[in-house]
Amino acid sequence: MREQLEALRDDAIKKIEQAQEKKVVQEIRVKYLGKKGPVTEVLRGMGKLSPEERPVIGQLANDVREAIGKAIESKMEALEQAEIHRKLQEETIDVTLPGRPVLKGGAHPLTATITEVEDLFIGLGFSVAEGPQIETDYYNFEALNLPKDHPARDMQDSFYFTDELLLRTQTSPVQARTMEKYKGKGPIKIICPGKVFRRDDDDATHSHQFMQIEGLYVDHGVRMSDLKGVLQAFAKSFFGEERSIRLRPSFFPFTEPSVEVDVSCGICHGDGCRVCKQTGWIEILGAGMVHPRVLEMSGFNPNEYSGFAFGMGVERLSMLKYGIDDIRHFYTNDRRFLAQFKRV
């Protein structure tokens, strides 16, 4: 029995030393030291030994069990250290390699344009006002001198929720709401940036959703020359000092008189080209003197107060300034397009 125990010990230790995985070592533990293992079987046969042999064989069996256990413990520790070393080797970082550059974002071209325009008009004494995108029929139309039968109120031009609620078609309702708040006492000098919505088919120059910036100045003695001076200052600052503007007669229900405002073409410098359709001028916004009826509906006495208003499309300004040929580029989230404006 002594030879049997020593052979078991040597065989187990040899297999433990050859094992390369923890799973194999665990299997050896179960095989030799488990309840059905050979060492346990030897201990169960102790009753057949003589009284003189029992303590000797019992001590040897315990020594064999302890030797196998220590070999298993030592091997498990070695395998764990080897696993740690392997992971460290795989995850080693070469600190001498150059770091990866941090990708920087930038303002969307429309955001950059709005910020630039806001800064320009704030420098001219205007403040920024905002209003709801879901607007009432009254503020979107009636308060702006667009009666019930006006063609601009056709369902084909507007997104209605109910008969009285719609997505605003312009930021002009902010002007009407602001004038109401002042309760007939000026001055008011604001710009109103924001999203507007119209039932247009999307193409290179039209979108069902776009950005507008409108302006309003109401005070005693405001004249058309004041409007022209403000817009001239804006055009020179936004497009360049060499640019000039011209005012053409037009019609808007909420202004009287009304004008379309053009800026001199920056490509041909007024000589005529494909971009300006050989006219030397490019339309940039609509404007005019606030209609007396609009002043009156907002609580101002048109005999005491006058004012001007203007409205411009942010996408159009961006397209003209940066040479963008399709309004849809602003809304496709193409990183190749947007990356060009990181410094804008």
Curated annotation (Swiss-Prot):
The highest taxon in the source lineage is Bacteria
Tell me the residue numbers annotated for binding Mg(2+). E256
Query: Mind telling me what this protein is named?
Result: Phenylalanine--tRNA ligase alpha subunit
Family, according to the entry, reads as follows: Belongs to the class-II aminoacyl-tRNA synthetase family. Phe-tRNA synthetase alpha subunit type 1 subfamily.
Q: Which CDD domains match?
A: PheRS_alpha_core
Q: Tell me how the cofactor is bound.
A: Binds 2 magnesium ions per tetramer.
**Which biological process annotations from GO are given for this protein?**
phenylalanyl-tRNA aminoacylation
What are the recorded GO MF terms, alphabetically?
A: ATP binding; catalytic activity, acting on a protein; magnesium ion binding; phenylalanine-tRNA ligase activity; transferase activity; tRNA binding
> What is one GO cellular-component annotation here?
cytoplasm
Listed under catalytic activity are: tRNA(Phe) + L-phenylalanine + ATP = L-phenylalanyl-tRNA(Phe) + AMP + diphosphate + H(+)
Question: Keywords for this entry?
Answer: Aminoacyl-tRNA synthetase, ATP-binding, Cytoplasm, Ligase, Magnesium, Metal-binding, Nucleotide-binding, Protein biosynthesis
Any keyword Signal?
A: no
Establish whether keyword Magnesium is in the entry: yes
Q: Which InterPro entries match?
A: aa-tRNA-synth_II (IPR006195), aa-tRNA-synth_II/BPL/LPL (IPR045864), Phe-tRNA-synth_IIc_asu (IPR004529), Phe-tRNA_ligase_II_N (IPR004188), Phe_tRNA_ligase_alpha1_bac (IPR022911), Phenylalanyl-tRNA_Synthase (IPR002319), tRNA-bd_arm (IPR010978)
Q: How does it assemble?
A: Tetramer of two alpha and two beta subunits.
Spell out the Pfam families in the cross-references. Answer: Phe_tRNA-synt_N (PF02912), tRNA-synt_2d (PF01409)
PANTHER family linked: PHENYLALANINE--TRNA LIGASE, MITOCHONDRIAL (PTHR11538:SF41), PHENYLALANYL-TRNA SYNTHETASE (PTHR11538)
Gene name per UniProt: pheS
Q: What is its EC number?
A: 6.1.1.20
Q: Where in the cell is it found?
A: Cytoplasm
* Organism lineage: Bacteria, Bacillati, Bacillota, Bacilli, Bacillales
Q: Which cofactor does it need?
A: Mg(2+)
